[in-house]
């Protein structure tokens, strides 16, 4: 079979011929139909993500859409290493598969997986969002952020505040369900005032943070003094991505003086059962609502040239 192979952590994967996997007991061999390229997969392939392995070669890809020998079409997660999803065939535990409805396209299902986990897993599994609560999405102009807006609306959020730097992209978020926007390009003091207004005056119960770095620091600083004297819902700050940096400066006094609860959502903070439940809920909702996501299908044979491509659409490799 042919597969994308990470042969070192400094170069993009290469399209190579390699022996197909053989399933163990309890596993299923899948013919892969589609596998999406995410920042998570890029990070694992270059060794920078916390879940990266240390041994090469391996095939990248944590999830995708495949077909079993019996014809069942499924979405799958967690292929057995070193067999990832970016290959003609892969192997996964049967327990790590979700049947897909016939009306969901292969490439769309694959593209929804990573941002879907980031969003559904965060809102349901970690933040436990309740209908009527307000959500602030930090970094809402990316693929996952746009999904988060739509999902928060679907789950009954009363208000959805979206942040980002690209003014044109911010202006388009209202069509997805954002009720307010905050520009991250404004001066720091103005940004703090905007966040204080959102947290203290308007009221926010859940923050989804796709960025970390300076904007996350500003949100947390704005929350200082916003305690819980009247028993109002606390601010559940869910950290999901770190595009703007891996570290921030956090005052101990901020945590003591506020109702902020810091949470993380990702591989390790969510159980396999919680991940599968979140994704099953997502695909059920997709059959009803059709969440907007822009995709760019690419033949897997073009993996090396597409790997470092910068574009707004989600690249989906088709073996």
List PLM regions with ranges:
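Short, glycine/polar-rich helix-capping loops at beta-to-alpha or helix-loop-helix junctions
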Residues: 85-86, 164-174, 247-252
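Local beta-strand N-terminus motif with an aromatic residue
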Residues: 87, 132, 178, 203-204, ...
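Mid-domain Rossmann-like dinucleotide-binding core that forms the NAD(H)/NADP(H) cofactor-binding site
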Residues: 112-186
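Adenosine-nucleotide cofactor-binding segment
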Residues: 153-226, 280
């Amino acid at each position: 079979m042919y597969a994308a192979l990470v042969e070192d952590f400094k170069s993009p994967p290469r399209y190579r011929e390699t022996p197909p996997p053989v399933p163990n007991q309890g596993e299923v061999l899948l013919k892969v139909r589609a596998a999406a390229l995410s920042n998570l997969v890029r990070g694992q392939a270059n060794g920078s993500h916390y879940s990266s392995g240390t041994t090469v070669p391996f095939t990248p890809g944590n999830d995708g859409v495949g077909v079993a020998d019996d014809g069942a079409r499924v979405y799958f997660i967690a292929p057995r290493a070193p067999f990832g999803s970016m290959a003609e065939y892969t192997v996964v535990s049967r327990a790590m598969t979700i049947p897909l409805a016939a009306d969901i396209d292969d490439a769309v299902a694959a593209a929804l997986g990573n941002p879907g986990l980031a969003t559904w897993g965060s809102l349901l599994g970690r933040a436990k969002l309740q209908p009527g609560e307000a959500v602030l999405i930090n970094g809402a102009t990316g693929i996952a952020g746009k999904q988060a807006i739509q999902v928060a609306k679907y789950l009954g959020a009363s208000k959805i505040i979206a942040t980002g730097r690209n003014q044109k992209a911010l202006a388009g978020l209202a069509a997805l369900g954002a009720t307010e926007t905050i520009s991250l390009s404004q001066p720091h003091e103005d940004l703090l005032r905007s966040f204080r207004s959102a947290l203290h005056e308007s009221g926010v119960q859940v923050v989804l943070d796709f960025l970390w770095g300076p904007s996350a620091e500003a949100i947390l600083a704005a929350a200082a003094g916003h305690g819980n004297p009247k028993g109002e819902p606390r601010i559940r700050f869910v950290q999901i991505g770190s595009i703007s940096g891996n570290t921030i400066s956090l005052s101990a006094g901020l945590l003591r003086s506020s109702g902020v609860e810091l949470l993380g959502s990702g591989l390790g903070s969510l159980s396999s059962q919680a991940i599968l439940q979140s994704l099953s809920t997502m695909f059920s909702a997709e059959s009803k609502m059709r969440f907007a996501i822009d995709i760019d299908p690419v033949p897997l044979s073009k993996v090396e040239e597409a790997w470092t491509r910068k574009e707004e659409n989600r690249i989906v490799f088709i073996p």
